[in-house]
Amino acid sequence: MQFAVKLTARQQQILDLIQSAIARTGAPPTRAEIANELGFKSANAAEEHLQALARKGVIELVSGTSRGIRLKGDALRSLNESRHREGGQFSLSLPGMSQLALPLIGRVAAGSPILAQEHVDQTYYVENTLFQRQPDYLLKVRGMSMRDAGIMDGDLLAVQATKEARNGQIVVARLGDEVTVKRLKRNKQVIELHAENPDYPTIVVQPGEPFEIEGLAVGLIRNTMLM
């Protein structure tokens, strides 16, 4: 995308890095991360380039935080439009990094497998080092029931497909025809699915009721810059 202001090659490189980091994690990189990625000897060199980008109006620097970088104007619009450029494929990785291709699951139809092709909205490409445990798919979060666990409406939950989970882990569970994200707690007689928001009740699964674990939450991609 052509910007209204002229950037040097190095400034464009740093701007691309900021956009990629925000798309990948929901947060901009630190000065140290920029310096390390681009081979600067110190974070001060990164700061000088950031100040130049701020003067040109493509970013805003926020004092008091190591990740205080906000995209503005054309730079922000360019990031928001990037998800539509390749026919449903959206890259959340930096150039040169090994990638995982993860299907994004939207709404799940009643009674059908969660990874059925009709549920796949698009494919995201992410760095294979982004998550400690490798996910099999991304699930778009709907609602605020897991708010206090930091999982917000519109976030992309990275899920490892499994039928097993331990007490206290956050799982994707199927209850009859519904799929939900909750914290698992097994008691002697019942299974409890706990929300992380006091406005939402605990779901109690009685013996004999339809219940199945579909996957385990292994990471999160913020919705901040994916709208």
Swiss-Prot record:
Family affiliation: Belongs to the peptidase S24 family.
GO molecular function: DNA binding; serine-type endopeptidase activity
Swiss-Prot/TrEMBL keywords: Autocatalytic cleavage, DNA damage, DNA repair, DNA replication, DNA-binding, Hydrolase, Repressor, SOS response, Transcription, Transcription regulation
Any one biological process term the GO annotation gives: proteolysis
Record's protein name: LexA repressor
Catalytic activity: Hydrolysis of Ala-|-Gly bond in repressor LexA
DNA bind region: 31-51
Species assigned in the record: Variovorax paradoxus (strain S110)
Enzyme class: hydrolase
